[in-house]
């Protein structure tokens, strides 16, 4: 029996000014991140806390779901995943199935248990919020390394962890103007992502606060 890995996620929405770009070997950094060893199959129990700050007020809401992932080394698909919501009770059992093709293409379907209906997610819908989580459908699929252009944007520390900072701009259609990605230079794992809705506005930030070794694989446990 596979014991699910418990993951806690905190997303903070706010605005920030972005500046500065330097072009070095950003693509090599992303290759190290994407080529890091991953388990062939995994089950994660994820608790998501969404924090919004507006007009001096802080609002919080929570979501919980199970995520099943399966990696493929050959065939028509590179990865398949299923997200199934546990909390809140009003959306219990709601699911999102994602299939990633070997060519980087993706197909998604969501399931509404109360209506017993499954529906395919259209390309134009991938920028929409998924079940009011602050995730959009695009966040729950994999983008290929050629789908974005990367440049090195500096070096910073996240806590005690030295990181190389990348800035990515989409080549393939994306709901985001760009992303700022903080990569741990020791583990080659992502520590933080800032999602830009425009050149000067960050719409949300994902923090990966704890990464531990499980069975020889580096996995985030607190986000």
Regions found by a protein language model. Name each.
Residues 91, 102-103, 148, 174-176, ...:
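Short solvent-exposed loop/turn micro-motifs enriched in small/polar/acidic residues
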Residues 2-11:
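Sec-dependent signal peptide recognition
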Residues 24-28, 62, 140-152, 200-205:
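A short, amphipathic edge element
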Residues 97, 107-111, 117-119, 128-130, ...:
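Gly/Pro-enriched, hydrophobic low-complexity segments
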Residues 11-20:
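Hydrophobic h-region of N-terminal signal peptides that target proteins for export
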Residues 21-114:
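N-terminal mature ectodomain segment of secretory-pathway/periplasmic proteins
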Residues 66-73, 151-157, 209-211:
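Short amphipathic beta-strand and strand-loop transition segments with alternating hydrophobic
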Residues 48, 85-87, 110-112, 122-125, ...:
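Short, structured patches in soluble enzyme cores that scaffold and shape functional sites
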């Amino acid at each position: 029996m596979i014991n699910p890995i418990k993951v806690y996620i905190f997303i903070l929405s706010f605005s920030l000014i972005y500046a500065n770009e330097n072009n070095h070997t950003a693509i090599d950094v992303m290759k190290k991140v994407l080529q890091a060893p991953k388990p062939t199959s995994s089950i994660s129990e994820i608790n998501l806390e969404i924090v919004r700050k507006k007009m001096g007020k802080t609002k919080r809401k929570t979501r919980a779901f199970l995520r099943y992932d399966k990696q493929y080394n050959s065939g028509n698909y590179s990865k398949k995943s299923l997200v199934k919501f546990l909390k809140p009770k009003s959306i219990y059992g709601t699911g999102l199935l994602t299939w990633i093709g070997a060519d980087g293409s993706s197909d998604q379907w969501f399931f509404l248990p109360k209506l017993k209906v499954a529906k395919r997610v259209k390309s134009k819908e991938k920028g929409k919020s998924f079940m009011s989580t602050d995730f959009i459908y695009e966040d729950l699929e994999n983008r290929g390394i050629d789908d974005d252009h990367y440049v090195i944007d500096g070096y910073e520390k996240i806590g005690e962890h030295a990181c190389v900072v990348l800035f990515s701009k989409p080549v393939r259609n994306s709901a985001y103007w760009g992303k700022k990605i903080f990569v741990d230079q020791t583990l080659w794992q992502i520590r933080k992502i800032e999602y830009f809705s425009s050149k000067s506005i960050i719409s949300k930030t994902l923090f990966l606060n704890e990464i531990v070794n499980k069975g020889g694989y580096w996995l985030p446990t607190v986000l």
